[in-house]
């Protein structure tokens, strides 16, 4: 029996390193893979292999990201590390690498720097739920009081952006010494302490299947003698024949009942997150439903027209605009399956936004869309993507 327990798949958790340039994010990433591989299995990735991050495309935006993995006693971690600051901004806004928690790396010698602040703010805006801190380069600081001071500054910064600064685990260490196999407190043991902090401070993520049902409408068909079938990919939750659902967005919310679930032309009892399914709806007419709406568990999501967003504007090289835009800019916002026109209100003191910038804005849509905080969208002009964003806060 003991053997079966050992074979059990470990819980999968997504994390990533954030923090100022040259504070040691990539060195720490390498140390995590090395010590993880030695203790719990997995593969060591050297600094150079991580630093040469391949480019990938997310929503038409090129982002350099390194993906590594390592294990703890109880979890399997998938970890992202980005070489440049711009890559972080793009990664977090597009949600290319969704994080269940982040490791904020801050040099003990330098303390919090501008990107330290910006990455914490971005984490708050895009909904990274938990942050654990690694105060790196502790071997370069002899003065214990100085370390304490830096730790206090980091805690204040976290609290300022609504993270629990006082309760956040902060581990002092040296990623470089740990990589060299140093056994002093700030070497290998510090990395093990960090992994333990990840295990305990970042709660188990809720799987998509366990969340309330939601399916964006991709297509609507009328099948004579049977009624209306709506197709799409189930984003979260489970849907069973006989369940009551709501149709939300664009127009007034309607209630209906699912009388059939189909996949690959076969009738099923239920569909779940990740499935491409067709749902047969009772008493619903072909014209009652359109692309851009969502089917959902009643009361689980509401339609909104006004929200605060964090937006990245594509540079000219990425195929974005060649010129800045100004207040009153009215592009299309592509949510899930459809474009909806909206007007942009820029922050006070911001006259224009240049290609390649990231900016906070308030958007007012001409039609309501079913949304929660954390929903990603693209900004388009005539079908061409010119930006990417995330709903930071719903206004109304």
Swiss-Prot record:
Keyword Repeat carried by entry: no
Binding site for Mg(2+): 26
GO cellular component, one term: cytoplasm
Entry keyword set: Cytoplasm, Elongation factor, GTP-binding, Hydrolase, Magnesium, Metal-binding, Nucleotide-binding, Protein biosynthesis
Region G5, annotated ranges: 174-176
Stated family: Belongs to the TRAFAC class translation factor GTPase superfamily. Classic translation factor GTPase family. EF-Tu/EF-1A subfamily.
Oligomeric form and interacting partners: Monomer.
Descriptive protein name: Elongation factor Tu-B
Lineage of the species this protein comes from: Bacteria, Pseudomonadati, Pseudomonadota, Gammaproteobacteria, Lysobacterales
Gene that specifies this protein: tufB
């Amino acid at each position: 029996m003991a053997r079966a327990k050992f074979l059990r798949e470990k819980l999968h958790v997504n994390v990533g390193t954030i923090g100022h340039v040259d504070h040691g994010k990539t060195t720490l990433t390498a140390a995590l893979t090395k010590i993880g591989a030695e203790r719990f299995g997995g593969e060591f990735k050297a600094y150079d292999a991580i630093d040469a991050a391949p480019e990938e495309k997310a929503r038409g935006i090129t982002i350099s990201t390194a993906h590594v993995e390592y294990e703890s006693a109880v979890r399997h971690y998938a970890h992202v590390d980005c070489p440049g600051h711009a890559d972080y901004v793009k990664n977090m806004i597009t949600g290319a690498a969704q994080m269940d928690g982040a490791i904020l790396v801050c040099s003990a010698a330098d303390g919090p720097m501008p990107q330290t602040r910006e990455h914490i703010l971005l984490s708050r805006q895009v909904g990274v739920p938990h942050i654990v801190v690694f105060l790196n380069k502790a071997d370069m600081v002899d003065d214990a009081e100085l370390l304490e001071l830096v730790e206090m500054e980091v805690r204040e910064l976290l609290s300022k952006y609504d993270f629990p600064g006082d309760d956040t685990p902060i581990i002092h260490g040296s990623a470089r010494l740990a990589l060299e196999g140093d056994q002093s407190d700030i070497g290998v043991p510090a990395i093990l302490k960090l992994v333990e902090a990840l295990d305990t401070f970042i709660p188990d993520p809720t799987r998509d299947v366990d969340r309330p049902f939601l399916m964006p409408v991709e297509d609507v068909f009328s099948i004579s003698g049977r009624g209306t079938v709506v197709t799409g990919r189930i984003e979260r939750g489970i849907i069973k024949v006989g369940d009551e659902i709501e149709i939300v967005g664009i127009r007034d919310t309607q209630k209906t009942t699912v009388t059939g679930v189909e996949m690959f032309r076969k009738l099923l009892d239920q569909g779940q997150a990740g499935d491409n399914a067709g749902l047969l709806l009772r008493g619903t007419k072909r014209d009652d439903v359109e692309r851009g709406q969502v089917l959902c568990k009643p009361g689980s999501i509401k339609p909104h027209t006004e929200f605060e967003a964090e937006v990245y504007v594509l540079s000219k090289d990425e195929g974005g605009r060649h010129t800045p835009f100004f207040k009153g800019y009215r592009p299309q916002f592509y949510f899930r399956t459809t474009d909806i026109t909206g007007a942009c209100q820029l922050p006070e003191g911001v006259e224009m936004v240049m290609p390649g910038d990231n900016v906070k804005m308030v958007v007012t849509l001409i039609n309501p869309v079913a949304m929660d905080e954390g929903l990603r969208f693209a900004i388009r002009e005539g079908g061409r993507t010119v930006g990417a964003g995330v709903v930071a806060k719903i206004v109304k």
